[in-house]
Amino acid sequence: MGSLSGLRLAAGSCFRLCERDVSSSLRLTRSSDLKRINGFCTKPQESPGAPSRTYNRVPLHKPTDWQKKILIWSGRFKKEDEIPETVSLEMLDAAKNKMRVKISYLMIALTVVGCIFMVIEGKKAAQRHETLTSLNLEKKARLKEEAAMKAKTE
């Protein structure tokens, strides 16, 4: 029985070694095809005539009239004449985010003002005894009278 467990142990370690060697010898290259590397440090062959592309430049965008207004309203520029011909997308995103925050603050302020206005109007209506209960009772009485008048005419 001892030799059987030793055989399993040897087979398992052999399998792990083979798996490690196979996975390290097959690697993806830049062109996404499998290439066999013999365990040495080999670099993929690149054509020497191919120009290397560098993407260090920030992509620029010509702003529309609406985007120019957003740049001015957000406080990035004072006048439309100061806005350059092309601006970075990050600058536009920052201006849009600033405008979103300003609009949300405005909406919060309008909501608070609306709530205060409704509280004041509700207190005035309560002083005039215009509650929902009294309004509903008056409406039901009026509907009953109309139904009685309609029944008399028929």
Swiss-Prot record:
<protein>
    <recommendedName>
        <fullName>Protein FAM162A</fullName>
    </recommendedName>
</protein>
<dbReference type="Pfam" id="PF06388">
    <property type="entry name" value="DUF1075"/>
</dbReference>
<comment type="function">
    <text>Proposed to be involved in regulation of apoptosis; the exact mechanism may differ between cell types/tissues. May be involved in hypoxia-induced cell death of transformed cells implicating cytochrome C release and caspase activation (such as CASP9) and inducing mitochondrial permeability transition. May be involved in hypoxia-induced cell death of neuronal cells probably by promoting release of AIFM1 from mitochondria to cytoplasm and its translocation to the nucleus; however, the involvement of caspases has been reported conflictingly.</text>
</comment>
<keyword id="KW-1133">Transmembrane helix</keyword>
<feature type="region of interest" description="Required for proapoptotic activity">
    <location>
        <begin position="76"/>
        <end position="102"/>
    </location>
</feature>
<comment type="similarity">
    <text>Belongs to the UPF0389 family.</text>
</comment>
<keyword id="KW-0053">Apoptosis</keyword>
<comment type="subunit">
    <text>Interacts with HSP90AB1; HSP90AB1 is essential for FAM162A mitochondrial localization and pro-apoptotic activity. Interacts with VDAC2; the interaction is probably involved in inducing mitochondrial permeability transition.</text>
</comment>
<dbReference type="GO" id="GO:0031966">
    <property type="term" value="C:mitochondrial membrane"/>
</dbReference>
<dbReference type="GO" id="GO:0090200">
    <property type="term" value="P:positive regulation of release of cytochrome c from mitochondria"/>
</dbReference>
<dbReference type="InterPro" id="IPR009432">
    <property type="entry name" value="DUF1075"/>
</dbReference>
<keyword id="KW-0496">Mitochondrion</keyword>
<dbReference type="GO" id="GO:0051402">
    <property type="term" value="P:neuron apoptotic process"/>
</dbReference>
<dbReference type="GO" id="GO:0071456">
    <property type="term" value="P:cellular response to hypoxia"/>
</dbReference>
<dbReference type="GO" id="GO:0043065">
    <property type="term" value="P:positive regulation of apoptotic process"/>
</dbReference>
<dbReference type="GO" id="GO:0005829">
    <property type="term" value="C:cytosol"/>
</dbReference>
<keyword id="KW-0812">Transmembrane</keyword>
<keyword id="KW-0472">Membrane</keyword>
<feature type="transmembrane region" description="Helical">
    <location>
        <begin position="103"/>
        <end position="120"/>
    </location>
</feature>
<dbReference type="GO" id="GO:0005739">
    <property type="term" value="C:mitochondrion"/>
</dbReference>
